[in-house]
Structures are given as structure tokens and as C-alpha cells.
Amino acid sequence: MPKRTDIKTILIIGAGPIIIGQACEFDYSGAQACKALREEGFKVVLVNSNPATIMTDPSTADVTYIEPITWEVVERIIAKERPDAILPTMGGQTALNCALDLHRHGVLEKYNVELIGASPEAIDKAEDRQKFKEAMTKIGLGSAKSGIAHSLEEALAVQAQIARETSSGGYPIVIRPSFTLGGTGGGIAYNREEFEDICKRGLDLSPTNELLIEESLLGWKEYEMEVVRDKKDNCIIVCSIENLDPMGIHTGDSITVAPAQTLTDKEYQILRNASLAVLREIGVDTGGSNVQFSINPEDGRMIVIEMNPRVSRSSALASKATGFPIAKVAAKLAVGYTLDELKNEITGGATPASFEPSIDYVVTKVPRFAFEKFPQADSHLTTQMKSVGEVMAMGRTFQESFQKALRGLEVGVDGLDEKSSDRDEIIAEIGEPGPDRIWYLGDAFRLGLSIDEVYAETAVDPWFLAQIEDIVRTEALVKARTLDSLSAAELRLLKQKGFSDRRLATLMKTTAQAVREKRIAEKVRPVYKRVDTCAAEFATNTAYLYSTYEAEHGECEADPTERKKIMVLGGGPNRIGQGIEFDYCCVHAALALREDGYETIMVNCNPETVSTDYDTSDRLYFEPVTLEDVLEIVDKEKPVGVIVQYGGQTPLKLALDLEANGVPIIGTTPDMIDAAEDRERFQKLLHDLGLRQPPNRTARAEDEALKLADEIGYPLVVRPSYVLGGRAMEIVHEPRDLERYMREAVKVSNDSPVLLDRFLNDAIECDVDCLSDGKRVFIGGVMEHIEQAGVHSGDSACSLPPYSLSQATVDELKRQTAAMARALNVIGLMNVQFAIQQKGGEDIVYVLEVNPRASRTVPYVSKATGISLAKVAARCMAGQSLDEQGIHDEVVPSYYSVKEAVFPFNKFPGVDPVLGPEMRSTGEVMGVGRTFGEALFKSQLAAGSRLPEKGTVLMTVKDSDKPRAIEVARTLHTLGYPIVATRGTASAIEAAGIPVRVVNKVKDGRPHIVDMIKNGELALVFTTVDETRAAIADSRSIRTAALANRVTYYTTIAGARAAVEGLKHLQNLDVYDLQGLHASL
């Protein structure tokens, strides 16, 4: 059936901020869908609260709303835009849940809007655990023995029933809440106490207060099938995926391999037929789904775990692994096409989309964790997802792609590095999976354990264990050799197994440089193969490439052109401190330079992103972003310029080495990047410009640090040099804390010194993004942070334009920014962080740090001002001046845009959610309003902090915050919210003549604050404490209780003031489209 003509306007719901379990794969699918539907002549309206996405670029959809994704707000957009249909399958769980809410509240009916891509019935049947189980039984597929519970009593009854059916004693047992994402709130319980804890949390987090309690399948094998089905019942399997880690670990936290490696042909056909039966029964007939299976290795019993009736993390992986654009195809199926009518773009239309992709290589995905940011979190892997990003690699064999993926992770390893030689530690680590288990598996074989012994501890399939054992055995042989004694054939064999130059250098006690020179001399070089969906049966016209070491005269398919090329280095895996914002910049660089007639080359290894989409750049190399891999590509392609300032710290770390190897880096020079990063050089630069910095010193030993600290005076910010995301930063108030820090943090510093800065109390922090062509400096935007200095800039909310600074201060910030940009000869982007302290009625400006690269605020500033800074800066790097691009005056919008950070604390119950100098947010949202208050309120709503319409507010603040707390209390009282406060705070509020009730601090006896939070007596909590370790520890129970009981809380007085500002706007919400806002500038 050709496309439908009865619908004209389609609303796409995005996925919102990046959280654990829902990352930038939905930006990739949403951007694809917008493109696909506009190609077909539909008008596309998009809503997404995340400004760091490509899909919210004003050019991606026809009308773009950066607004909170709640059904009430989306209803306003529907009323304004009157779409004919909603496509809810591109925005992950957020979009599905929002679409179901619209359905339940009668909004779809009221405005006569149809859901396309998946019907409410199909979504419900797939997402509602009980209905799904009944559907599976109906088509004769097994599912785990389980039951549904809506209360703790029911849950215990189900558990007892399963214990009787499975004769397993009833533990371990798995708990899965309905309609949540990435297994949120779920887990595995090994005893009754754990069971009750997990059930209570799960009931609370499930929007339908429903749990599925099921038998434990720990140790079973897990597989996924990516399936696409159309109205005519054409079905194709895009890709089979096998989890290296057995059941019991969320698939998002597992190492996965495609295509599945350990299935026999017969088993594969059984899974294939089963997955098609599942789609038919659930009723998915216009798009993609992923179906997860589990197989008991003992007796072959197969069961269906779950299916997602939408584009998912796995489908992004399958798209990148095969080159088959699932999201684009699913969007076209949703408007009536069938698979045989669509062409496969990769083969230039030589094959229809109804051909199943076949691949002649192996793909390995490895997750990236961020537990170093959450030392109190439980790092054991269970059914609740905890990873923050992932790396994908391709090779001709499992070993090659596996070792490439490990070095692409950027966790300080070059392959299967040694973790430990302590037998007890190794046995414990392989038995209880944590983020490093794969390296401990290598250590187990180094100890001499057999495959059977390791299998007994881990339940990892013996085929994978044999591959890992072989890598370890090979390493032992290499250790006994010298580099000179290796023949070309031996070296090639090692490279075919995926060993990196650096790993070989470590094993043979030499340098990576020496290994590289030997390789070049012996002509052992990689060849590049194309991803073509058809195992090279048809010619492909897209250059989507990966490296591999083949036999001596292996055919290289790179086939470089003679055009002028610019190469962009991507940011590698998502992590806290380096996320989608950097990918956004890389994509914009590729798009801008492509428009200008350069051939663009992208190098990256993150499968979730738009940058690794085969049609973002002219040529895509899906490779780890390491020196060895980048130098080989440069040698092949010979670009005229390489951009390193867009991918965050990942490419920057390579800048000096690349330059030393003759790679043409364009934009700000690596030497100047170093001048800004190196403490002593930067100090001299500021001194020459006559700019202020907080008093600071550099210490190289503990005793020296204590002496220097006394010179500056406490409180201090201490940190190692060269960090991103504030890793290992702390605010210390006394020598005792500093001693402890020096003992613990020297581990972090790799012989690099520790930096001490005077901490500026009660300062306002600001960010300025600017760009320069080497002559003129253009200010992109000045942002004022809402949280005070001392909260990491990535975790602070901020406003553009500033909401409280005087024009004179803003002008001074711009003057200082321009002076530094000139002194550093910046070509491209630069970001400066300032702190402003009031002394005697005057604003004193201090420079905190300068980053001569793209910063994480670039996408937000671009959305707020309507100028794509990353595009303009990329053109500057390629030699176009600002005048030639017609960029003259800074844009200061007449409306406010507020960016707010989003945190993963609900995934890590043990972690204290207090904000500090370490960055811990995973994503961001933006709110737009005519006033600062309106924009702020929307940013809170979008970040999931519900501001209550009524109810009691608790205030407990440190002494220095009391004057401002009185103002907050006065507004609350005027708005009609009753106030309770702890003794000290209450007497200050009372003295100002505002009614308040006194409550007990936790140490003053019961009933105290935490009891009130647990009993649901409080609607909002404002709690601020001194930055001392003791004060933070004392008050921790208030914050964790508020978090656990889902009471909205603010831990800074600035946040509290902002929240109260937002409370004034509860009733009247307006929605604004980006195109309309930009047109008004």
C-alpha cells in the first residue's frame, strides 16, 4: 500500500533528557523519522525537552517545541497545531507513556488524533506484564513462571506460589515494575528482606503501581531479535544479538555480540519464527520491535522475556551494526508503505528494504559505567540498568571486534589488561558481576583456571570463554618474545586477534611508537571494509567503514577520493561529563563543511549517536578514537584538516601526539589548548592581561599542600590537573579534610600535581560561550547560573539572558572573554567560566577556567539564540571569516531560556543527592518563557520535578542563607503554602513576622523531619548545609528520604528561590515553537 493521503500533519514525541536507560539512541531515531516523513511531504511537529539533540534543531522538523513532555503540555501543543496523527514509537519509554496518558485522558479522542506506528492496544499488550504473559501462552510460547502484584501482600503471596511451582526455595527471585524504563525500580532479591525493599521501591516507581514477580533465570543465555513488520505481514529480522553475559544482567549493561555466535541453524530458525509470532500476536504491523529470549543451556527450554513495540537501544545498535536504518523504515511503514515498496539506501536502491541484511563481520558492544562518580552506589550489575554509555566495534572475528571495543571504552585499558593476581578477589569478581568482570575473566585464565571452572562461576557460554582464554594464552607467548624477533606473519596474526600497538608494547616492554614503526616497516597495515547490508553481494555507494587485518593482500575497500577533506574526531562513548552535547557539535561540523563542498570524514565508536549515522558525513569510520586508529585513517585519507575541539576530552587528549605525527589540526593550536589547561601557563596569561583569578597554588606533595593551603586560606577547592566533569574535585574546609584528600586523590593524579583554589563563598557563577575566526571575537551567549559557585557548571541550572546581573557586569564579562580569546589565538569555539563576588556594592569578576573547545552549553546557547555556534565555528576553522559568514551582532533574546540538569540518583539508592564540584548529571532539559519565572518553571517540569500546587513546605538552611530564606518564606506565605522549619531557621523566619511551625532535626528526637517526609506530610523540601563533610553527612538522611519518597527537594538557596519563582506560574502555561521564537529575534 502506498502512503496514506488522509493525514497531513504528524506529531513526533521525543525522549526528553538523557537518563540511564534512555540515551541518545532516541535522538538518532527521532531525527531519522523527521527526515523520512518530511521527504514524503508530511508536516512534522516535534516536541522534546532536550536542547542537546539534533532533532530539536529548527531545520529537522517543520515546527519544534522544546517543552516538557507531560500529557498536559502536549495537549496544549495538539490544541495549537491540530496534528492528524502522533508517532510515539521514536521517543523511547517517555514517548510511549505520554501517548498512553493522552489516550487515557481522552485527549486523542477530543482532538481526533490517531496513534500511528503502534496502536494503544498493542502498546498496552506489550508493556502490561500480565497481558503480555497471557498473549505468549496463547501462541504456545513459554514465559517465566510469574505473577502480578499491586501491593506488598500480593507480592509475598506470588513469591510463595512461585516457590511451590519451581521447587527452588523461592529465592533468588526477580521483580520487574510495569511501564518503567531500563528496569528502573526492579532487581533480584536473594532473601525476604531484599524482596520487600525492592517491591516497595518498584510499586512506587511504576506509574500503574504494578509489579511482575518472576522466577529467576540466572545463568540462562539471552538473545534478542530485531524485527520489522508491515501491514502486508512482510517480516524481516534485521539482526540477531547475543548477550555474552547471561540472564540476570540488564541487556543494556551486558556485553552483546551480533550476529549471535553460539546458535545452531536450527535454533536460529526457532527464534526467528517465534519472534515473528510474537509481533503478529501483539499486533505490531507498522514498524520495528525487539524481542528478547532466554534459553536454558541445561535443557534447551526457551522462553520470551519481553518485547518493546518501539524503536529501542538495541535497534539503534542493530541499525549501526548492519547499516539498515530501522527508524527511517519504521517511520515510513507507519504512514502506510510496505517493505517491498521501500528501497535500501545503502545499496543505492539495488535491493528493496524487504531483503534481510546479511553481514560478514562480527560486532561487539561493551557498556561504559560511571561508578567512579557514585562511590556510595552498589556497583553490582542486576536487572536494573546502570551503564551510562556504550562502545561498538567491528572486526572479521569476535576477538578482533572485542579487543577493539575494549580499547574504545577509554577506561585506561588497551585490551584485556590485568586487573589483579589475587585469587580470592578474582573468584569473587567473576562470580558477582560488576563493571570490570570481563577483565577479571582474563585474570582467571591467567591463574590457570579451566574453561569448565570459569563457566561454573559465571555461566558465560564456553565458546566465549575459549576465545578469551586464547587471548590470554597468546599474551603469555608474546611476553616471552622481543619486538625484533617477531616476523611479519606473527605480527599480522596478533593484529588479526585485535591486539592494539599499546598492548603489544606493554607485553614486550617497549613503546607503542616502536611497535607502530615495526608494523609499517613490515607492511602490516589494516585494510578497510564497507558495511553494506549484503555481505558484498551488491555494490554500495555509502562509505561506512571499519578496519580489519586480513591476509597479506587483503582487499581494501576504502577507495579514498581526491577531494578536499576535513576529518572530525567524535567523543567516543557517552559518560557523565561528556555526553550528547559534544556529539551535537561534531554533527554540526560535518553538516556545515559538507554544505561548503568539503568531503567530511567522521571517526567515532558510539552506536547511539547521530554522528555515526551513515548519512551525516560523506565517510564514516566506525573505529575507536585512539592514536593508533586515527593515524591509520589519516594515512589512508590524507585530510587537509582534522577537528579535535568538538569531541570533548577524547580527541583533545590526542591533539599533541597527532600534531607530532604530522597530522594537520585546524582551529586553535594544540599548544594554545595546552596553555589554557596548564595551570602555570594560564596564570601567566591572565597576569599579562590584568585579569583576576581566585588565589591558587599547585602542590606536588602532601606536606607542601598543607603549607600552601595556609597561604591561601580555607575553604579550598582541590582537584587534580586535567579533568573533565570535575572528576575527584572536592571543597575542603579544614586541614584534616585536605590530608585525607591528598591520601585518596593522589591515586587519581598520575604523577600530575594537585591544584588548590580559594573557594569563593556566595559567588554567582557565569558561563560565556564565544567563537573567533582569529581576528574578531563573537559572543554566542552569556549565561547566569542559578546554583551558586561550588556546584559544578554541568550540574547547575542556568539562564540566558542573565536574570540578575547588571548590564555593566555583563559587558565586563564580554570584554574579558574577548581579551582571553585573542591572547590564546582562538580559532573556533571557546568557553569561559566566571565567578562574580560582591564587595562593597561592587561586582568583582574572577576567571575560574577557560576551555578553548566546544563546551556542553553550545547546543543550548544555539537553540536559545537561533545561531548554530558549532557550524559557524567549524567554518572559521576551515578558513572562512565571521564577516564572510555574515555573523556580526550578538543575539540577546527577548525571552528567557533556562537549562536544567537531570540526575540519575533514583538508580543509585545509596547515593547522597547533594550537589557539589563533581559533575553527576546525565542529561539536560530546557524551558522557554516570556519571563524568567515561566522558563524556570517549565525547566523544572521537564526535569521531572513536580512543583506542588498546595501542601506544606519544609525549610532548614545554613546560617549564611538565612537572610535569603526569609524572602523565600515570605513569598511562600503569600502564595498560601504553610511553612515548617527547624529551630534556627524558624526563629529567623518568625523574627521577620512570618508564621512558621517548628519541627525536630533528626538528632533532636522524634517525630523529626525524616518521619514527616516518610509519612507524606511534606510537599516540598528546601535544605541547605555548609560544605563541610560533617554537615553534609549529618543532613544526608533528609535528602535521601526526600529522594526515596519522591518529594521535590532543593539543596541550594538559589534553587529554592528559583522554585518559588516557578510556583507563581503553576496555573498559566503557554507553549512556544522554536521557529516562531527565532523569527522574532
Curated annotation (Swiss-Prot):
Binding-site residues for Mn(2+) 4, renumbered to this chain: E849, N851
GO MF assignments: ATP binding; carbamoyl-phosphate synthase (ammonia) activity; carbamoyl-phosphate synthase (glutamine-hydrolyzing) activity; metal ion binding
Instruction: Kindly list the positions annotated as binding ATP 1.
Output: R129, R176, G182, G183, E215, L217, E222, G248, I249, H250, Q292, E306
Q: What class of enzyme is it?
A: ligase
Annotated ranges, domain MGS-like:
945-1081
- Kindly state which reaction or reactions the protein catalyses: hydrogencarbonate + L-glutamine + 2 ATP + H2O = carbamoyl phosphate + L-glutamate + 2 ADP + phosphate + 2 H(+)
The task this protein performs is described as: Large subunit of the glutamine-dependent carbamoyl phosphate synthetase (CPSase). CPSase catalyzes the formation of carbamoyl phosphate from the ammonia moiety of glutamine, carbonate, and phosphate donated by ATP, constituting the first step of 2 biosynthetic pathways, one leading to arginine and/or urea and the other to pyrimidine nucleotides.
Binding-site residues, Mg(2+) 4? E849, N851
Q: What domain notes does the record hold?
A: The large subunit is composed of 2 ATP-grasp domains that are involved in binding the 2 ATP molecules needed for carbamoyl phosphate synthesis. The N-terminal ATP-grasp domain (referred to as the carboxyphosphate synthetic component) catalyzes the ATP-dependent phosphorylation of hydrogencarbonate to carboxyphosphate and the subsequent nucleophilic attack by ammonia to form a carbamate intermediate.
Q: Return the SUPFAM superfamilies for the record.
A: Carbamoyl phosphate synthetase, large subunit connection domain (SSF48108), Glutathione synthetase ATP-binding domain-like (SSF56059), Methylglyoxal synthase-like (SSF52335), PreATP-grasp domain (SSF52440)
Cite the residue spans of the region called Allosteric domain: 945-1081
This chain is encoded by the gene named carB
Q: What is this protein called?
A: Carbamoyl phosphate synthase large chain
Chain ranges of the ATP-grasp domain: 133-335, 683-878
Q: Which residues bind Mg(2+) 2?
A: E306, N308
Instruction: State if Iron-sulfur is listed as a keyword.
Output: no
- In this chain, Mg(2+) 3 is annotated as bound at Q833, E849
Q: Which residues bind Mn(2+) 2?
A: E306, N308
Please list where the region (Carboxyphosphate synthetic domain) is annotated.
1-410
> Could you give the cofactor binding note from the entry?
Binds 4 Mg(2+) or Mn(2+) ions per subunit.
Gene Ontology biological process terms, A to Z: 'de novo' UMP biosynthetic process; glutamine metabolic process; L-arginine biosynthetic process
Region span, Oligomerization domain: 411-558
The residues the record assigns to binding Mg(2+) 1 are Q292, E306
